[in-house]
Amino acid sequence: HHLLGCAADLIAGSPDDHRLLFRLIQETHELCGLEFTQLILEPGARWIHISYVPGNLRCQVIDKEKSPN
């Protein structure tokens, strides 16, 4: 998705900041219907991947800290 200009890796500061931002985006999706294609918390919470591909808004949430595969 990055090569299509439909994704970004967000860097919020510390790993704890990344976890907090990930949860905030996830909760905003659940409570307010925020749409995206993928939301991924990378291992070690180094960054958050988020993508938005029109026509493919599956709202897939992956926490690689909980499940590294």
Language-model segments: what does each one mean?
Residues H2-C6, A12-N69:
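Catalytic cores and adjacent binding grooves of peptidoglycan-active enzymes
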